[in-house]
Amino acid sequence: MDEIFVELKKLGAFAAFAWSHAPADNYGVIAIDGQNALRAGDKTAEKVPEGTIDWFTRSPASTVPGEVESLLDRLGASWYLNSVQYESDTGLLHYEWVWQYG
């Protein structure tokens, strides 16, 4: 699972996280939200971490969404694009992916 964090940091925008009252033009957030478990024979056979990747940008031409999806495919993660929204309070486009990897 750490591989997702390492690879996202290589994209650049995920390299540093800082709190600010004025949002940056482009930034990403990755979170682990929980896990899914496969049960077999009344026991947990496998556990897979699940999380979200959020990308915020002012540019509708941002290449990062495609890079995130290519990265998740390359790592063999299960994922889907959950939503793309315009955040009217910040003026940012917000992409959200849900992923499972393990």
Predicted regions and their residues:
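Small/polar-rich, solvent-exposed N-terminal microdomains that initiate assembly or binding
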Residues: 1-39, 60, 64
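Short amphipathic alpha-helical segments, especially helix-boundary/capping motifs
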Residues: 27-29, 41-46, 72-73
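A common structural junction motif
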Residues: 12-13, 71-79
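A broad, low-specificity signal marking well-ordered, structured residues that form hydrophobic/aromatic
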Residues: 28, 51, 97
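Short, charged interaction patches at domain edges and termini
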Residues: 3-7, 14, 33-48, 82-102
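Short glycine-rich, basic-tinged beta-strand/loop micro-motifs
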Residues: 45-57
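Short beta-strand-to-loop capping motifs
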Residues: 55-59, 99-101
